[in-house]
Regions:
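Metal-cofactor-binding active-site regions of metalloenzymes
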Residues: 2-289, 341-343, 347-359, 363-466
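A short acidic, glycine-rich active-site loop
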Residues: 268, 317-323
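C-terminal amphipathic alpha-helical interaction region
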Residues: 293-295
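Hard-cation-handling environments
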Residues: 299, 304
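Short glycine/proline- and charge-enriched loop/turn segments
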Residues: 308-316
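Divalent-cation-assisted or electrostatically stabilized phosphate/pyrophosphate-binding catalytic cores
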Residues: 325-329
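Short, basic/hydrophobic alpha-helical segments
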Residues: 332-338
């Protein structure tokens, strides 16, 4: 059988092949948004078998197994690692046309040298044995070095002491590992008990009693300063929508007091006004320090109550939300811009219908401060597939500047997911190569190739100042 993952995988023209092999393939990776555990990097985690590195914590794979009718004990339960791997392998043939099929075979090829068999129930034993042999010498740091990673930005709560980032920074590990300030829990006022528990952690980290809304802002500012001192230059906010709810300071204070001292339910409009206020305050902090601010907009989380109670969050029970936030986004950006507090911003939407809306909106707020200052982020989560990436690239190309795009990221908890950069680069080169062949772009490989190199490496390196 011809190798599925070959040198020209996804590259359907000679121009695509030239672009990829000459301008993209060997570029270092700037993975500016991921969910890797910095402790696992610092401690150079090793794995006993492929199930641990491949299936542990990967809710993408878990969802596919559930869709294939696999019992939960083989997914997150007490089945053996070998049994779990077998069940995932049996699911693989059902995944044709799902990006997981491509991702998995790219990972098998790049990290384990397995490119001569396709994973299935029948080949599971062979792949298990071959992969586990390689894992004897493969570690977290080795995965990063082998993938030519230059820098990563993890995702960290403001209460983190950043111990492991400090350890990595003081070591001889050549990959930059920077924290990202992600204060989502400071917004989550609807759940009184959880919010109060979180504020207790924030109080301890910031060394302040939080008894008012102003105290909350002081605490966040102290942690923001601490993160900056430890190399952080990026923030991230996971929000269900963008809010624009005008409220007086005393109303925000009343809502905060209700959150920390009352069992009275907070009304949706009160929560929206509070979240809008905190988001704007944090945006101002980001701008003052010259950080890049990221907004991830739109997921509908924890849909399955039974499974949420059994497994908690981030277990594969989130989906695409839907809201109309064009006007709110306009007002949000305009208010920050008018106050001189709109810094570099990347907006990721989970619903593909919002691609053009956001891309067009961002053109209203560009600046000579930095070319491509405000960006539509790469296709995210459920859109992280060939079709979703293509649609996102079309929106950027048609309504913004493709040549200023900062490119791809993994958004992953897995040390094997760096092949997603390769996947994106191959698609980008295939799109541009196809248009060169059809005469829609100049047949000038150097011209188009420079755009490819910029998106793959130069643009994110400059944008994030890494």
């Amino acid at each position: 059988m011809e190798k599925f993952i070959n040198d020209d995988f996804l590259l359907e023209s000679k121009y695509a092949q030239e672009l990829y092999h000459n301008y993209a393939e060997n570029q270092p990776l700037i993975d500016f948004h991921c969910h890797l555990d910095p402790a696992e990097i610092s401690q150079d985690k090793h794995w006993d078998n492929i199930t641990q590195v491949w299936l542990g914590g990967d809710h993408y794979k878990w969802r596919t197994m559930r869709s294939n009718g696999i019992e939960e004990k083989y997914i997150t339960g007490d089945a053996s690692d070998r049994e779990k791997f077998q069940k995932f392998a049996e699911t693989m043939p059902m995944l044709l046309r799902n990006p997981m099929y491509h991702w998995c075979h790219l990972e098998l090829a790049r990290f384990f040298g397995i490119d001569d068999v396709l994973l299935s129930g029948d080949t599971a034993e062979e792949v298990w044995n071959r992969a586990n042999e390689v894992l004897k010498t493969l570690s977290a740091k080795e995965c990063m070095l082998r993938s030519n990673v230059e820098a990563v930005c993890t995702t960290d709560d403001p209460t983190s002491d950043l111990q492991y980032h400090k350890e990595i920074a003081s070591s001889d590990f050549k990959v930059k590992v920077r924290p990202t300030f992600r204060p989502d829990k400071a917004f989550a006022i609807e759940d009184h008990l959880s919010y109060i528990k979180y504020l207790e952690k924030l109080e301890k980290a910031a060394d302040i009693e939080i008894r008012s809304y102003d105290d909350l802002l002081v605490a966040l500012k102290r942690r923001h300063d601490f993160f900056h001192e430890n190399g952080c230059r990026v923030s991230d906010y996971g929000v269900e929508t963008i809010w624009h709810k005008k409220a007086f300071n005393y109303e925000i204070e009343d809502t905060f007091q209700k959150a920390i001292s009352s069992s009275e339910k907070i009304a949706p409009e009160e929560a929206a006004a509070f979240k809008d206020a905190v988001l704007r305050e944090c945006a101002a902090m980001d701008c003052d320090k010259g950080w890049v601010r990221q907004l991830h907009i739109g997921p509908l989380r924890n849909n399955n109550k039974v499974m949420f109670e059994a497994l908690g969050a981030d277990a594969g029970f989130d989906s695409i939300g839907e809201s109309n936030y064009a006007k709110a986004l306009s007002k949000h950006l305009n208010n920050l811009n008018s106050a001189g507090k709109l810094g570099k911003t990347i907006i990721y939407n989970i619903h593909p219908k919002d691609n053009e809306m956001i891309a067009a909106m961002l053109g209203n707020f560009q600046s000579s401060d930095f070319a491509g200052k405000i960006q539509l982020g790469s296709a995210w989560w459920f859109m992280d597939n060939l079709d979703g990436m293509r649609r996102q690239l079309e929106a950027v190309s048609n309504l913004s500047l493709l040549g200023r795009f900062v490119g791809m990221l993994t958004d992953s908890r897995s040390f094997l997911s760096y092949t997603r950069h390769e996947y994106f680069r191959r698609l980008l080169c295939n799109i541009l190569g196809d248009e060169m062949q059809r005469g829609l772009l100049p047949k000038d490989t150097a011209l188009v190739g420079q755009v490819v190199a910029n998106i793959a490496y130069n643009n994110p390196k400059a944008y994030f100042n890494l």
